[in-house]
Each structure stands twice: as C-alpha cells, then as structure tokens.
Amino acid sequence: MRFHSFLIKYGEIGIKGKNRYLFEDALVRQIRFALKDVDGEFNVHKAQGRVYVDCEGEYDYEETVESLKRVFGIVGICPVVRLQDNGFEQLKKDVEKYIGEVYPEKNQTFKIEARRSRKSYPLNSMELNCELGGVILDAYPEMKVDVHNPQIRLNVEVREEIYLYSEIIPGPGGMPVGTNGSAMLLLSGGIDSPVAGYMIAKRGVALEATYF
C-alpha cells in the first residue's frame, strides 16, 4: 500500500484561539525545513484546521517519517491513502483493499470513524460508518466491530478527495521551535545541559549554544 500524504496532528496549538494560525504557520515552516534534505518532493499545507504533507511522486517513506518524528509541535503522524472521489461503490472497493493490504491477518476488531467535511457528499458520517463497516464484515468475516477499544480505527475523511488512514505514529509533542522566543544554552560537557536544551526547545524556544 502506497501512502500519498501524511496528516499531521498537533496538540497545544489547537487551543491558541485567535493566534492559532501563527503557530500553525510556524509548524508548517518547521516541517518544510525538516524535509528539505529528504528524497522526494513534498507539499506542506494547511486545510480546514489540519496540516498535511502531500508526497509528490516517489519518496523515501522511512526517512520521511523519521524526519517528521523530530519536529516539535507534532503529536501524531498519520500515513494517508489519498483517493479521488469516484463514487461510493468505488470507495467501498478502496476500503476493502486498504484493510486487505495493510492488515493481512484480517482477524482484528475494528471501528470506522468517518468525517464528512464536504457536505454535498450523498451520505452523512453515520451512514458512512454503517455502510463501510458492513463492507469490511462481508469481505473479512473473522473481523469484528468494537466501538470502544478497537484494534483498528479506520478514519475516512471526505473532502474534495477522500483520505483513508488508520495508524498514528507518535511525534515529540511540544510547540514549534521559534514560537516562544530565543535563549542561549551553555553546554558544559555533561548530560544535563543537552537534556535541558532539548526540553526547553520542545517548548518552542529557539536556542543558540555556547561552549567553554
């Protein structure tokens, strides 16, 4: 299964009120900087309160994920399969294929979590949950629905395109570097000063280091 995009989840940035866009813009800049030396072409952008990394053409998946895992401000990284909207019948086939390729065991519990941002889509979120859940049960009878603690949580987001994702890779959290001023870090040669530097950088402080 080829993942075409990454959905970036953030934490504290989401409670910043009217200044939220400043923190989102800083996160986008930091992601672009982290990916500048990674093989591949990437389009990092915001859309409807989300941050996405769209992968144009071939790219190094492992290197991309490792680079994103080092960006402060990212709470989770979701590899996304991005689909053209070719009708609901095609979506059912795509969901069946996604489960078949990503989860070869086909005996786990699952839950569908649909989100319909494009209100013109003919089915609402609850109808998508029910219909797509039925598709998986028909295709893979050993799988069971568990709405409370599923092993697989398949997210289906209906936008101009359709996004499928089920994995959340943990990020470092914190705030994007540069959103909370700057400071000088004295590196004395012990372990405590780099640890302190990491922790303060995680709070969004841009650091300059000095040695003696």
Question: Which residues does each PLM region occupy?
Answer:
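RNA-binding accessory domains that recognize and position tRNA/RNA substrates
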Residues: 1-184, 194-212
